[in-house]
Amino acid sequence: MPNDATLPTAEAANPMRRATHNPLPRGNDADTLALEIVEKLTYSLGKTTGVARMYDWMDATCLAVRDRIIDHWISSTQKVNKDQSKRVCYLSMEFLIGRLLRDAINNLGLAEPVKQALARYGVELDLVELLEPDAALGNGGLGRLAACFMESMASTAFSYTHLRAHETRGNL
């Protein structure tokens, strides 16, 4: 892995972070992603690039990608509310979603920039993705159908809500 002294630090990603607590405008280029991943690594996980393990890189990458998903989520929710659009709500007792990091990166169009951002620190995106556990919620056909249904809606930028019933001691 490269020497910490030659790589951007979390302070470089956001020098006013402590003073303003305002998020950076999120760019989708490799430079911005690299800085934000390091910021997550430092301020969310308490690690430096020199001591971070592969799981730390996975967590930091997930957090940086999640921020972009939240930006899209807030924007689309505001648009749906403003336009008073209809919504699709899907209720499922089981839900086989699989691994989400690769899907999220692809749906945001960030596959190459994230790969380049991690490569700057000697980290391979393919190895990071393998660390994500499969959620394995549910046990079969309907769960897989729910996941496919939602994935197709996400890939086509269709606004939807997923509701999941939790059973506790026989009560929903």
Task: Go through each PLM region and give its residues.
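Extended, charge-enriched "interface" segments that sit outside catalytic cores
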Residues: 2-83, 87-97, 101-108
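Anion (oxyanion) recognition and catalysis
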Residues: 154
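Residues forming anionic-ligand binding surfaces in small-molecule and nucleic-acid pockets
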Residues: 115-134
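The substrate-binding groove and active-site-proximal loops of carbohydrate-active enzymes
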Residues: 135-139
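A conserved hydrophobic secondary-structure block that centers on an alpha-helix together
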Residues: 143, 148-151
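Conserved small/polar residues in nucleotide/adenosyl-binding loops
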Residues: 161-170
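Flexible loop/turn segments at secondary-structure boundaries
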Residues: 97-100, 144, 169
